[in-house]
Regions:
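Juxtamembrane helix-loop-helix connectors linking adjacent transmembrane helices
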Residues: 92-94, 99-106, 112-120, 141-210, ...
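Low-complexity, intrinsically disordered extramembrane tails and loops of integral membrane proteins
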Residues: 1-61, 177-184, 336-343
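C-terminal membrane module of polytopic membrane proteins
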Residues: 276-343
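Functionally important transmembrane alpha-helices
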Residues: 79, 83-87, 246-303
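Membrane-interface helix/loop boundary segments of multi-pass membrane proteins
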Residues: 207-232, 259-266
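Alpha-helical transmembrane segments in multi-pass membrane proteins
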Residues: 73-140, 310-312
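Hydrophobic residues within alpha-helical transmembrane segments
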Residues: 203, 232-236, 272, 276
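Hydrophobic core of alpha-helical transmembrane segments in multi-pass integral membrane proteins
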Residues: 82, 129-138, 166-173, 309-329
Length: 343
């Protein structure tokens, strides 16, 4: 009986010691992960329950991919793939887009050239992006990168969030227009017709968002944090568009799409917004306004004052978005540093 009593006392003493240890541990970490989750930015749609941009698990492995060397390697890989695909298609009898015919004053010649360009791109683009995505996944694995294949939160289908993103994309296009006019024009190699529409509005958003945001942004974020992931993916997205005006435009759009992806935790919304942006571009091409600025269009109708108002509002939206990006990245960096210190 005495032995049973002594064992019970020993067990109770151990239990009390364990409870004290747990209590002291909780007191050392007064803020939970949920408390550190940033609130939704002003003007954005209401956030879904639970944090959507919490820092990575501090116990997660340290990844080697991607570095800035990897960025150069991936861009080089993309160029090589494009050249190989073009060479194979030429051997198969395909015709490269003819710049002279595309810009011909003869409408019949131009229409045939645009149809041929659309047909060539319709085969070249999916082959190029399919190979690029596959080889990037292999390269990422060999280099020791995070293996996530994107995030697909249903919040990305929130209509209010989508409308906010569309407004932001449209405003950004207006703000960038004067700067892009200082750079050489982007050649019109896209073509016309249903093939060009399907390629730019469906294929390109799906493939490029999966590669740039789903694979590269997540991998870079796992390695160096949200700011690194955002910058890395936007740079790659910009550089692979090659032409100076397209590079600048794609880089800025890449920053915005990356920010929205981080905030929403969803590829759905960035694919939709990318498709919306490309659809606007295709609409302008189809209507014959490919090289006409909004300023020129509105000035021709005596609406210079209205353009000033539109540009001012767009600039305000753009600056607010930039502030939101900066605040979100700063907050995430604090969380990532806190997680690293707690490791």
């Amino acid at each position: 009986m005495q032995k049973r009593y002594e064992k019970a006392c020993i067990w109770e003493h151990r239990h009390l010691s364990l409870m004290k240890f747990r209590k002291s541990h909780r007191e050392e970490v007064p803020v939970s992960m949920d408390d550190t989750a940033p609130s939704a930015p002003e003007g954005a749609a209401p956030a879904a329950s639970g944090p959507n941009d919490a820092p990575a698990d501090p116990a997660a492995p340290r990844y080697k991919f991607p570095t800035w060397f990897d960025l150069l390697a991936l861009v080089g890989l993309f160029v090589v793939i494009q050249l190989v695909v073009a060479f194979v298609l030429l051997l198969a009898g395909a015709r490269m887009p003819d710049a002279a015919a595309l810009g011909s004053a003869d409408e019949t010649v131009a229409a045939r050239a645009h149809a041929a360009a659309a047909q060539f791109n319709f085969y070249a683009y999916p082959l190029t992006m399919g190979l690029m995505i596959g080889l990037t996944l292999i390269y990422r694995r060999l280099r020791g990168g995070n293996r996530r294949l994107g995030r697909y939160a249903v919040r990305g289908l929130n209509p209010a969030l989508i409308l906010w993103g569309m407004l932001l994309m449209a405003a950004t296009n207006v703000v960038l227009e004067p700067l892009l006019q200082l750079l050489p024009e982007i050649p019109d190699f896209y073509g016309r017709g249903w093939r060009a529409l399907l390629l730019t509005v469906v294929m390109a958003p799906l493939a490029e968002e999966f590669l740039c945001r789903g694979i590269l942004l997540d991998a870079a974020r796992a390695k160096g944090g949200a700011a690194y992931g955002l910058l890395f993916s936007a740079l790659f997205f910009g550089v692979i568009h090659f032409y100076p005006a397209a590079v600048v435009n794609a880089f800025v759009m890449g920053l915005l799409l990356g920010f929205i992806y981080i905030r929403s935790n969803s590829l759905y919304i960035v694919v939709i917004l990318h498709a919306f942006n490309n659809a606007l571009a295709m609409l302008l091409l189809t209507l014959g306004y490919a090289h006409t600025t909004l300023y020129e269009l509105m000035s021709a109708h005596g609406l210079k004052m209205l353009y000033t108002v539109v540009y001012g509002v767009s600039l305000g939206i753009f600056l607010v978005a930039g502030y939101m990006v900066w605040k979100t990245i700063a907050r995430l960096r604090e969380q990532e540093q806190a997680a690293a210190e707690a490791q």
